[in-house]
Structure formats: structure tokens, C-alpha cells
């Protein structure tokens, strides 16, 4: 995101960003491994997650935890090559992510807030690594967008008719909560960001915000029609409409 919105980036910034990318990816991957290990029994009953290596038993739990700790050490070690603010943001992200996996994901609606914060920390870290301050309106927009994305993921899980009248394992939701999650997702994803369209101080962000709303609207529409993969991000990256949106964004950036 910083590269899209910032006018010019130096070569040193690019080099630092590459290191930061791998550093954050390693720490984030550890979180996903923890999550899969803790969700093993639930994933084994899921129609698509049952094919994950840990759920299948290809990777033992002890091996998974060992791998996760190695990734954390490698990620933090890489971050020490960068400025202290990035390292601090990485540690905060790790604490939020791992606390979510081990504990907070069991609490309905709180988990959406924590997931939104985790995604937001990635954006903040992207600015910190190149010694820039992220615009406050952008952070507000991004946070509501990420909560909507987290709500979308939960909504897809609860749209499974086989879960009717059941509580989702290791989650604080029931099948009947899908409408509440839908309301939260639409409110945070569209109504709140729409107010920023009338904020003149972020005029340069309006085209970016409009494209995000278009892409998010397409995802929610497909989820409502039950035509979306369990992973909204995967669906976004494999959707033709998403590429059209990205193409429009690049054209606007180049010719602006």
C-alpha cells in the first residue's frame, strides 16, 4: 500500500521493504501454523480444511510447533536489520496473532476486532520500515475494511448448512449468528468508509477507497450467493473482477 500511495521510493527503501516482507512473512507463517495445530480436530471435520498437512497428520503437532518457533526466531532476527520501530510493530503483531490463535478466537465478535488489528499492524509496519507516517484517515479506512474482511471469513463459515443449530468448534459463533456478522461486515466495510469520501483532506485516497469498496462489494455478493471459497483472499486473487479493479487502480496511479 505505501508504494501505491507514496510519490517516490528510493532504492534503499525497496531493499528494506524486501527484508521487512520476509521478516513479517516468517512471523505470520508461524501464526498460521499455530492456528492449524490448535484447530486440528476441527479442521479434520471441515470439508476443505481437512486436506491441510497438519489435519491429515502429514506433519506432527510437535514438528509443527518446532517449525513455528524457528520461523519466529528467523523473522525477529531479520527485523533487527531494520529500524527499531518496525521491529516493535512486528513484536506487537506477533503477540496479537498468537494470542488470537491460542485464546481470543473463542470469543465472538472480539475475534473480528483482533483480526482487524492484526491486518492493520501489517499496514503500519509497511510505513514504518520506510520511515513514513501512515495517514490517519487511511488507517481508519483500513481498519474498518479489515474487520469487514474478517467478518466475511466468519460469515462464509456460518453459511454452511451442515452447521445449522450447532456451535462452530473453537469459535464463539452459532449458525444463527450469520445475520449479525453480515450486518457488522457490511457496516464496517461500506457505511463507515463511505463517510471518508466526503473528507477533502484525503482527496488523493478517494480513488483508492472506491476501488477497495468495489472489490469488497464483489466478495460480499459472492459470499451471500454462496459462491466464494473459504479463504476470501484466495477468492480475491483468483477473481477476474479483482484483476480489473487492480488494473484500473494502476492506470489511475500512473496517469495521476
Which functions belong to the PLM regions below?
Residues 63-105, 190-219:
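Transmembrane helix-loop-helix
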Residues 1, 21-29, 66-77, 81, ...:
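Generic alpha-helical transmembrane segments of integral inner-membrane proteins
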Residues 1-13, 101-136:
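Long, highly hydrophobic alpha-helical transmembrane signal-anchor segments
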Residues 1-5, 9-38, 85-100, 204-207:
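Membrane-embedded alpha-helical segments that form the functional core of polytopic membrane enzymes
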Residues 120, 124-256:
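C-terminal membrane-associated helical module and adjoining short loops/tails
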Residues 37-47, 65-68, 87-101, 148, ...:
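Hydrophobic, membrane-facing alpha-helical anchors
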Residues 40, 45-90, 136-147, 180-192, ...:
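Multi-pass membrane catalytic core of lipid/isoprenoid biosynthesis enzymes
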Residues 24-53, 110, 149-159, 218:
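Acidic (Asp/Glu-rich) catalytic motifs at the cytosolic membrane interface
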Amino acid at each position: 500500500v505505501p508504494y501505491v500511495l507514496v510519490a517516490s521510493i528510493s532504492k534503499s527503501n525497496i531493499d528494506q521493504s524486501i527484508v521487512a516482507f520476509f521478516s513479517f512473512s516468517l512471523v505470520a507463517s508461524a501464526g498460521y501454523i499455530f492456528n492449524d495445530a490448535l484447530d486440528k480436530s476441527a479442521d479434520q471435520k471441515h470439508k476443505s480444511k481437512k486436506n491441510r498437512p497438519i489435519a491429515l497428520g502429514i506433519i506432527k503437532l510437535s514438528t509443527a510447533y518446532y517449525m513455528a518457533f524457528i520461523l519466529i526466531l528467523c523473522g525477529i532476527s531479520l527485523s533487527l536489520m531494520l529500524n527499531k520501530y518496525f521491529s516493535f510493530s512486528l513484536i506487537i503483531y506477533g503477540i496479537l496473532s498468537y494470542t488470537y490463535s491460542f485464546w481470543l478466537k473463542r470469543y465472538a465478535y472480539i475475534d473480528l476486532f483482533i483480526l482487524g488489528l492484526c491486518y492493520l499492524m501489517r499496514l503500519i509496519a509497511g510505513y514504518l520500515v520506510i520511515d513514513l507516517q501512515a495517514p490517519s484517515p487511511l488507517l481508519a479506512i483500513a481498519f474498518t475494511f479489515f474487520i469487514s474482511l474478517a467478518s466475511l471469513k466468519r460469515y462464509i463459515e456460518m453459511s454452511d448448512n451442515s452447521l445449522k443449530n450447532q456451535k462452530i468448534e473453537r469459535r464463539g459463533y452459532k449458525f444463527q449468528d450469520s445475520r449479525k456478522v453480515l450486518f457488522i461486515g457490511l457496516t464496517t466495510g461500506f457505511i463507515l468508509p463511505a463517510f471518508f469520501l466526503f473528507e477533502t483532506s484525503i482527496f488523493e485516497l478517494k480513488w483508492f477507497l472506491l476501488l477497495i469498496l468495489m472489490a469488497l462489494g464483489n466478495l460480499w455478493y459472492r459470499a451471500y450467493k454462496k459462491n466464494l471459497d473459504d479463504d476470501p483472499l484466495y477468492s480475491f486473487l483468483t477473481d477476474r473482477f479483482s484483476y480489473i479493479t487492480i488494473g484500473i487502480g494502476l492506470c489511475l496511479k500512473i496517469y495521476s
